[in-house]
């Protein structure tokens, strides 16, 4: 039985997700920024359905999260997906934006950080995202650090992703996570991946090849009293990956140009991502779809392994 508070006044559960949590089925939370900001309509809705299908194929239930009418949507119906995909101007909601958007009663597309807030409130221990935010290059001057990293220290949710984007300072990102005692586990890989690239050039703190051992590690982390996330990474499929050196060269050149044009803060990330997409002649589109699907599938697999592990523990 779930410990979820289904009467929480800030949560609106879909019937499917409510039943799954109530009966102890594995559930995977998903963000809605990819729907409202990632792709044009109707491609965005079709992509969201593919991501949900990848979770279902592994035996888990997807719970796409959004904000509407003063509550978090925990799981979206087809009508919800269509509305979020076709409505223009939905603001991107990170952790700091949640109270204002909830109070105004408007719509909000959840990021990694805000999705973790909702997943934790809803009692969903797994979340999938293609890639996380991190410490930006030049953060020693700008102090530009993604809210994702801060939220990892506050939410008891296992985050499955393909690492962080190469446009970030991945060395400092890993240092920050180490300082905050956030475990990093790379599934069937020795390296910390970098979204489009199979390796960031940095060795992962832990490699685990067994889903049950990962499930046990997550359980141990929370049994120790930690209130933070566990980060589980898995690299993009080799056939869809873009070379690390190629991407790094593009980013360095684009970063210089961005600085010259005075592009900083929130505008820097989309600027650099567009530069990579243009220079690789659209290879990033295929790569992005690949990591969206593969991380969702792995999250579904690990959520099932976690449920099985907990059931075995309860029977012991």
Swiss-Prot record:
Catalytic reactions on record: D-ribose 5-phosphate + uracil = psi-UMP + H2O
Cofactor(s) in the UniProt record: Mn(2+)
UniProt cofactor note: Binds 1 Mn(2+) ion per subunit.
Domain of life, source organism: Bacteria
Example of a GO biological process term: nucleobase catabolic process
List of residues binding Mn(2+): 144
EC number(s) stated in the UniProt entry for this protein: 4.2.1.70
Active site: 31 (proton donor), 165 (nucleophile)
Induction: Moderately expressed in the wild-type strain. Expression is repressed by the HTH-type transcriptional regulator PecS. Weakly induced under oxidative stress. Expression is 10-fold induced during infection of Saintpaulia plants.
This protein's UniProt keywords: Glycosidase, Hydrolase, Lyase, Manganese, Metal-binding
Record SUPFAM superfamilies: Indigoidine synthase A-like
Any matching Pfam family: Indigoidine_A
Alphabetized Gene3D superfamilies for the sequence: Indigoidine synthase domain
Gene Ontology MF term list: hydrolase activity, acting on glycosyl bonds; metal ion binding; pseudouridylate synthase activity
Record carries keyword Cytoplasm: no
UniProt KW Lyase keyword: yes
Function: Catalyzes the reversible cleavage of pseudouridine 5'-phosphate (PsiMP) to ribose 5-phosphate and uracil. Functions biologically in the cleavage direction, as part of a pseudouridine degradation pathway. Part of an operon that could be involved in the biosynthesis of the blue pigment indigoidine, which is implicated in pathogenicity and protection from oxidative stress.
UniProt similarity note: Belongs to the pseudouridine-5'-phosphate glycosidase family.
HAMAP family: PsiMP_glycosidase (MF_01876)
Assembly and interaction partners: Homotrimer.
Protein's recorded name: Pseudouridine-5'-phosphate glycosidase
Source species: Dickeya dadantii (strain 3937) (Erwinia chrysanthemi (strain 3937))
């Amino acid at each position: 039985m779930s410990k979820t508070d289904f009467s929480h006044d800030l949560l609106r559960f879909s019937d499917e997700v409510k039943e799954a949590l109530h009966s102890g089925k594995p559930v995977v939370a998903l963000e809605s920024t990819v729907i409202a900001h990632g792709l044009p309509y109707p491609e965005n809705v079709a992509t969201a359905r593919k991501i949900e299908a990848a979770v279902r194929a592994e035996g888990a239930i997807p719970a796409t999260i959004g904000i509407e009418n003063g509550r978090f949507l925990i799981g979206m119906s087809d009508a919800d997906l269509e509305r979020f995909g076709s409505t223009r101007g939905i603001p991107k909601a990170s952790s700091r934006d949640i109270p204002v958007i909830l109070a105004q009663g408007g719509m909000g597309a959840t990021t990694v950080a805000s999705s973790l807030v909702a997943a934790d409130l809803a009692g969903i221990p797994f979340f999938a995202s293609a890639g996380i935010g991190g410490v930006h290059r030049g953060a020693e001057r700008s102090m530009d650090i993604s809210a994702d990293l801060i939220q990892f220290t506050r939410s008891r949710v296992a985050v499955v992703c393909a690492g962080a984007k190469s446009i970030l300072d991945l060395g400092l990102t890993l240092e920050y996570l180490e300082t905050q005692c956030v475990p990093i586990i790379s599934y069937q890989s020795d390296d910390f991946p970098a979204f489009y690239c199979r390796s960031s050039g940095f060795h992962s703190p832990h490699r685990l090849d067994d889903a049950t051992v990962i499930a046990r590690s997550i359980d141990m982390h929370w049994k120790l009293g930690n209130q933070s996330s566990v980060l589980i990474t898995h690299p993009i499929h080799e056939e869809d990956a873009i070379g690390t050196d190629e991407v790094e060269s593009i980013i360095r050149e684009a970063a210089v140009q961005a600085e010259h044009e005075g592009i900083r803060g929130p505008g820097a990330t989309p600027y650099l991502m567009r530069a990579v997409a243009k220079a690789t002649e659209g290879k990033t589109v295929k790569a992005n779809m690949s990591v969206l699907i593969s991380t969702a599938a792995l999250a579904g697999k690990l959520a099932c392994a976690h449920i099985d592990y907990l059931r075995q523990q309860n029977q012991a």
